[in-house]
Each structure stands twice: as structure tokens, then as C-alpha cells.
Amino acid sequence: MAPPLSPGSRVLIGLIRVYQRLISPLLGPHCRFTPTCSSYGIEALRRFGVIKGSWLTVKRVLKCHPLHPGGDDPVPPGPFDTREH
């Protein structure tokens, strides 16, 4: 079971949701990764909290450019992730 979300994580997830609903449809699908960078950001914030989740999200967004091949890039397992790998 994941820990409850901090207020900071909730705010950042809310901002990402605004981007997904209002800005992303205007830009069209162009993320080179699976999951998309915004979905990755939400999952990273949920798994790791505001500090590490934000850092992982920033690193991911900085990789999303035409010179990077993209592809499958899931969020790393979190401390409360009980799935076997």
C-alpha cells in the first residue's frame, strides 16, 4: 500500500492534470516515451513523494527531445512496491 500523498504532491499532480486536460490536447501526441511524461510524473509523485518524484519527472522531461530515441521508460519501483521483478 502506498503512503498518503503529501500536500506538495497533490498540488504538483493537480498541475500535471491541468496540463493533460488543457494544454496537451492543443499540442497533440508527441511524447517519445511510454508512459507519457505527464503520466510518468504523476506515478513518480505517487510512488516517491514530492522531492524524489519531482526529480525523476524533471530528469524524464529533459530526456524527451528529438535526439533521444525514447521508448519504454517506466517509473522505478518505489519503497512500497510489493510486486516481484
Swiss-Prot record:
Organism domain of life: Bacteria
Membrane disposition: Peripheral membrane protein
KW GTP-binding (keyword) present: no
A Pfam family it matches: YidD
Keyword Membrane among UniProt keywords: yes
SMART domains (UniProt xref): Haemolytic (SM01234)
A cellular component term, taken from the record's GO annotations: plasma membrane
Main function: Could be involved in insertion of integral membrane proteins into the membrane.
Similarity section: Belongs to the UPF0161 family.
Protein's name according to its UniProt entry: Putative membrane protein insertion efficiency factor
Organism: Enterobacter sp. (strain 638)
